[in-house]
Amino acid sequence: MPMVTRRLRDPDVNPCLSESDASTRCMAENNYDKESCSSHFLKYKNCRKFWNSVMIQRRQNGVKPPMPTAAERDEILGGLGKMPY
C-alpha cells in the first residue's frame, strides 16, 4: 500500500475515515449512482468542514498538533453530546 494511502487510512490523520468508507461503500452497493448516496456525501463534507474549523482554531491558539488525535477527537465529540455533522 503506498505511503499516501496508508496515511489516509490512519484514524489519527483522517478524522472522517468512517464517513469516507460509508460513502465509498454506498457507491459500490448502488452501482455508482451518486444521487442514491448524496446523504453520505453530505455527511462526509460536513465532517471535513467541522474538523477543518477545529484545526484552524487550534492553529490560531498555538495548539500542537493542529489536528487532534483520534483520542482527543473522541473527547471533543463526547463533550458536545452529539455529532455536530
UniProtKB/Swiss-Prot annotation:
InterPro entries: COX23, Cys_alpha_HP_mot_SF. A motif (Cx9C motif 1) lies at residues 16-26. Keywords: Disulfide bond, Mitochondrion. It comes from the Eukaryota. Disulfide bonds join C16-C47, C26-C37. Residues 1-20, 61-85 are annotated as: Disordered. Residues 13-55 form the CHCH domain. GO terms for cellular component: mitochondrial intermembrane space; mitochondrion. It is found in: Mitochondrion intermembrane space. A motif (Cx9C motif 2) lies at residues 37-47. Belongs to the CHCHD7 family. This is Coiled-coil-helix-coiled-coil-helix domain-containing protein 7. It comes from Bos taurus. The gene is CHCHD7.
